[in-house]
Curated annotation (Swiss-Prot):
Residues 8-239 form the ABC transporter domain. This is Spermidine/putrescine import ATP-binding protein PotA. It comes from Listeria innocua serovar 6a (strain ATCC BAA-680 / CLIP 11262). PANTHER family: SPERMIDINE/PUTRESCINE IMPORT ATP-BINDING PROTEIN POTA (PTHR42781), SPERMIDINE_PUTRESCINE IMPORT ATP-BINDING PROTEIN POTA (PTHR42781:SF4). PROSITE patterns: ABC_TRANSPORTER_1 (PS00211), ABC_TRANSPORTER_2 (PS50893), POTA (PS51305). GO terms for molecular function: ABC-type putrescine transporter activity; ATP binding; ATP hydrolysis activity. It is a peripheral membrane protein. The keyword Transcription regulation does not apply. Pfam families: ABC_tran, TOBE_2. The complex is composed of two ATP-binding proteins (PotA), two transmembrane proteins (PotB and PotC) and a solute-binding protein (PotD).
């Protein structure tokens, strides 16, 4: 049995500025020690506010924030065992790499030998050994990020907070840094809490993801759970690309949409309950119109390098996106084939607690 330790806990936390609507609205969650977490959502969803509340840069309007079993609402930022890596890295341009990393240790008035040992170890962890005397202006974007991370880990925090640190990098470097950050977190064993609006970053790097919208956590779970079992239309649409249509759950394992009934793997709904149905573009296969489970007309097509994106319209006017290596022509009448496992049925207005209970009931039946 694996024993997990909760390091951060939010209990009914609300953050409101003046008389504006809450930026965070009665949010509760737990962060376990030694994992890589991502707060994911669009601009203004509250993800950076959570980070600032943990860091101590903001104070909660309501609710309690715990570090371990201790309430930290009133503890100032400089007394909390957390360090933040900012979007612009916040490095000192007049200091070289070594002095940037050593800055916090000098503030703590550590002895010179202790500072040197910690700085050298931190630089080794981020693969910057030998860059001690390099000026910040001479560093690339990826190298500057590693300096910022070294400065964060040198203080041996319990938690590292990362506020969209990859957003300023080009695509190739951003991908490389995703692997580096994930590897670094595993080697350090420190809890990382990463903020991003990029769902691909979140899926690639995280042990756990919190999906936020309008100040509320919509869903939390592993990347695979959230991608394969989105709780609602927002999550399904925000995490990857989705085809979402209205449907009706006829009975367990049978759903109706686009005027036809299909076998599925979902259960626990009321007979004839109105639902929303999700099928991912990569789970659709183009066939002849006669062989397809759905008949559609090709509306547009784009070449994406590794595959084509094909947009189609069904008889009800629903739009369908397909990822395929098969080339078709605009105006073609084609069929779409898919397996029962490709269908995901979502209950309207279901809370995360209700959703989790329904998924647990699947396991009990199986």
């Amino acid at each position: 049995m694996i024993v997990t330790e909760t390091i951060i806990r939010f209990e009914n936390v609300t953050k409101q500025f003046d008389n504006d609507p809450p930026v965070l609205d009665n949010v509760s969650f737990e962060i376990e020690k030694g994992k890589f977490y991502t707060l994911l959502g669009p601009s203004g969803c509250g993800k950076t506010t959570i980070l600032r509340l943990i860091a101590g840069f903001l104070e909660a309007s309501e609710g309690q924030i715990y570090l371990g079993d201790k309430v930290i609402n009133q503890i100032p930022a400089n007394k909390r065992p957390v360090n933040t890596v900012f979007q612009d890295y916040a490095l000192f341009p007049h200091l070289n790499v070594y002095e940037n990393v050593a800055f916090g240790l000098r503030i703590k008035k550590l002895k010179k030998d202790a500072i040197d040992k910690k700085v050298q170890e931190a630089l080794r962890f981020v693969n910057l050994k030998g860059y001690e005397k390099r000026e910040i202006s001479e560093m690339s974007g990826g190298q500057r990020q590693r300096v910022a991370i070294a400065r964060a880990i040198v203080n041996e925090p319990e938690v590292i907070l990362l506020d969209e640190p990859l957003s300023a990098l080009d695509l190739k470097l951003r991908t490389e840094m995703q692997y580096e950050l994930r590897d670094l977190q595993k080697r350090l064993g420190i809890t990382f809490i990463f903020v991003t609006h990029d769902q691909e970053e979140a899926l690639a790097m995280s042990d756990e993801i919190f999906v936020l919208n309008k100040g509320e956590i919509q869903q939390s779970g592993t990347p695979i759970d959230i991608y394969d079992e989105p709780i609602n239309k927002f999550v399904a649409d925000f995490i990857g690309e989705s085809n979402i249509v209205n449907g009706k759950m006829i009975q367990d394992f049978e759903v109706e949409f686009v005027e036809r009934r299909f076998e599925c793997v979902d259960q626990g709904f009321r007979p004839n309950e109105v639902v929303e149905v999700v099928i991912r573009p990569e789970d659709l296969e183009i066939t002849s119109a006669e062989k397809g489970k759905l008949q559609v007309t090709v509306d547009w097509m784009l070449f994406r390098g590794v595959h084509y994106e094909v947009g189609c319209i069904d008889i009800d006017g629903n739009e369908w996106l397909v990822h395929t290596t098969r080339k078709v022509r605009v105006g073609d009448k084609i069929g779409l084939a898919f397996e029962p496992e490709a269908i995901h049925v979502m209950r309207l207005g279901e809370t995360e607690e209700e959703f989790d209970k329904r998924l647990d009931s699947y396991d009990e039946v199986q």
